[in-house]
Amino acid sequence: MNSFVSTVLLLSVTIALVSGYPSQLQTTCVTKAKSCTMFFLNGVYCTECTYSGTLELKIGSTCTFSIYEKKVASQPNENSQNEVAQCKQSSCYSNQFVPVDCAAAFGNEYITYIENQ
């Protein structure tokens, strides 16, 4: 009976250790930048800032690369993309990007990180 209890205890510890081990390695690399230009328009002092960021996400053998860009102008015109983020994504091994939803590509945590500069 003692060996049965020891065997059950050993198996449960082994199962607990194995189940806690990640099955696929995940790595994340995030960059962010902010650039602003200042100009005079119709006698008004204006600024336009661009918030940009990248996210490289590797899960196992799958790798995606996403680009985030958002322009914010103090005097928006009718052609501007003011306050509308534009995102695109590709495989890490390709340079052919497709437009994607920013929330899906980056998630709220990384969008907040990029925009808080």
Curated annotation (Swiss-Prot):
Keywords for the protein's UniProt record, in alphabetical order: Secreted, Signal
Keyword Zinc: no
Keyword Signal: yes
Principal location: secreted
Locations listed in the record: Secreted
Signal peptide interval: 1-20
Pfam families: DUF1505 (PF07403)
GO CC annotation: extracellular region
Family from the record: Belongs to the UPF0375 family.
Protein name listed in UniProt: UPF0375 protein C08F11.12
Organism: Caenorhabditis elegans
Lineage of the species this protein comes from: Eukaryota, Metazoa, Ecdysozoa, Nematoda, Chromadorea
